[in-house]
Amino acid sequence: MKHVLKNDWGLLLAPEFEKEYYRELDVFLKEEYSIHVVYPKIEDIFNALEYTSYENTKVVILGQDPYHGPNQAHGLSFSVQPGVKTPPSLLNMYKELRDEYGYDIPNNGYLVKWAEQGVLLLNTVLTVRQGEANSHKGKGWEHFTDRVIELLNEREKPVIFILWGRHAQAKKKLITNSNHHIIESVHPSPLSARRGFFGSKPYSKVNTILANMGEREIDWEIPNL
C-alpha cells in the first residue's frame, strides 16, 4: 500500500510511510484487500492528496471514513463516483449551497471540481470494508491523517478548516497556528442538519475569507453529468 504521491505531499509525507504504525497498517491493508471487498480501490486511496497539493490547499473539509457501499467511495470525503445516488449528507450540503448561492442541486455527487480548486476533501480514515462502517478505525490511518493536518497547520499561508460534527471538531487541537481559520457547525447528516448546519453559510464564509486574503474564491457549483 505504499504510495508514491506525485506532488509536494510526497516529500512531506515520505517519513510516515517508514514509521512502525504505517508498516503495521500496510500489513493489515494487504490482508484486507486480499480477503474482503474494501473501498475505495487501492489506486484511489490517496486521491484527496493527489488532487489537492499541499501548496495549493486553501480549504480542508474533514470527513470520517469512506462510504462503504458499492461504487461510492473514490478517495475524496463526501464525494461519490459518477452515476451513484447522492448520499443524504451531501444532498444536505447541496441544499445549503442552493440556499446560499441559488445553485441548482446537481444530478451527481462528484466533487472533483472542488478538489481541483484547492479544497482538500480529507477523511480521517482512508479505507473501509464493504458494508461495515468504521471497520478500519483505529488501524493507523488516524496517525497518518493527523500528520496531514499538522503539516497544514505548520504552513504560514492560511488554510480554512471546515469541521462539521464532533468527530471533525476533535481535530481542532491540531490546529494551533493563529494564521488559520476554522468554520464549524453540526454535521450535514439528516440526523443533525436542522440543528445548525442549515443556515450556517459555510461556502460564502470561505469565499469571504479568501477574498479578504486576495485569493481566488471557490466556485462551489457542481455541474450536471
Curated annotation (Swiss-Prot):
Q: Looking at the keywords, is Lipoprotein present?
A: no
Q: Known catalysed reaction(s)? A: Hydrolyzes single-stranded DNA or mismatched double-stranded DNA and polynucleotides, releasing free uracil
What PROSITE patterns does the database record attribute to this sequence? Answer: U_DNA_GLYCOSYLASE
Instruction: Return the EC number.
Output: 3.2.2.27
Q: Which UniProt keywords apply?
A: Cytoplasm, DNA damage, DNA repair, Hydrolase
The domain of life is: Bacteria
* Enzyme class (EC, first level): hydrolase
SMART domains (alphabetical): UDG (SM00986), UreE_C (SM00987)
**Single Gene Ontology BP term?**
base-excision repair, AP site formation via deaminated base removal
- In terms of one coarse class, where is the protein primarily found? cytoplasm
Q: GO CC annotation: what is one?
A: cytoplasm
InterPro entries recorded? UDG_fam1, Ura-DNA_Glyclase_AS, Uracil-DNA_glycosylase-like, Uracil-DNA_glycosylase-like_sf
- What residues sit in the active site? 65
Single GO term (MF): uracil DNA N-glycosylase activity
What NCBIfam families does the annotation carry? PRK05254.1-1, PRK05254.1-2, PRK05254.1-4, PRK05254.1-5, ung
Q: What is this protein called?
A: Uracil-DNA glycosylase
Organism of derivation: Bacillus thuringiensis subsp. konkukian (strain 97-27)
